[in-house]
């Protein structure tokens, strides 16, 4: 394949300047926020290289150089070398636990003299390239056959497994954002619903375990009720014969009535056995109807309870796999335990800082919670609380607005691509940003457990910043292949 020769003047003329402007505003605001978060009264200036803000500014300068080099490279070259890059990063991920030092129970950082690198960040970049390369294959259609879906899932899951071996759960979860890309490329929304339903099952099964209904832990009881409700809703969607829906609803209603009467009569009902039997009989009936009438869509409501109930019983096993401090953080977020001086300390102090900022904030460098170091990690994962305290509600809204604008701009670039590679890659980057943005803000305000997800362009970190700029550099590179907008 021959590649286009690209000169610097051509890059400056064809670059997507609105996206560049938004990005510049964010990285500049990020350096200022890091300076504010790490500032003390005896500290040197913002650009002093001995301080976090100065180091971040140096990383920005180096990253801009890297980004400009990327812009000078024909984007088709990234498509050509996507798989080799992906394989090299997988090898690096495999090696990392054997050479990385143990830092807070995780072996995910490779130390090279004064510099530390996190291969998981490079894996995000490489996985996006590999996924885009797969989709750009000749006549590749994700939904055409199951093997295509399996290949896409394998590309996403391999780095997840290797990163989990490093005990770096937060970084591994980031790759789940790529399933939004699969949805954009034609996968059924049923799988996204399944992912949301799995999260609901996980939360309910863990949170409601202290009490019981009919001898069943309260969480599991309501999950089973929810499974029956989902089966009925799916029958509305996938079933064209009213008698099947009527029979299933009637079976559920009759079973509930019998159980209620027996309970009133003082009969000890083995609740779990009965409910599993009721759901199981309904699932077998639907499978029989699917085979008898060649209505294969009925297999969806027939198999859904099997998968959901299996996952419900495996929740405790999955929860036990987590590190003790991760379990405690989840319990604190769900309100199972209160530990304001331990696992819940960061989040509690963060919420105090944001709440004290009010509408307009306390002013630049005038924060009390942040300046007195009440919030740990405030220059990395919890940097948003510095913004909320010093700049207030309006400052926080401006930052959120910049994120929304950048994500929408990347999506626009994706939708206007001539090439499948460019479209899928841009959507991968947008999905990463959405995940980081939502989870980090959720962590800071107590809606999500603290899992070490930084805020892109704002949190301190050279590796993450360099990879984010490289990702944006390729997005800007492929943006030169955008379809022209139609004149109105």
Task: Spell out what each predicted region is.
Residues 22-25, 32-33, 42, 46-341, ...:
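Hydrophobic alpha-helical transmembrane segments of multi-pass inner membrane proteins, especially
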Residues 1-13:
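Short, Lys/Arg-rich, polar N-terminal cytosolic tail immediately upstream
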Residues 168-173, 362-367, 378-380, 451, ...:
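Transmembrane helix boundary and interhelical junction motifs in multipass membrane proteins
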Residues 11-12, 148-149, 372-375, 417-418:
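Helix-boundary and loop/linker segments of multi-pass membrane transporters
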Residues 2-3, 482-488:
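Short, charged juxtamembrane terminal tails flanking transmembrane helices
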Residues 28, 229-234, 446-483:
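Transmembrane alpha-helices of multi-pass inner-membrane enzymes
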Residues 329-383, 391-395:
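TM-adjacent membrane-interface loops and short helices in multi-pass inner/ER membrane proteins
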Residues 385, 396, 427-428, 456, ...:
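Pore-lining and gate-forming transmembrane alpha-helices of multi-pass membrane transport proteins
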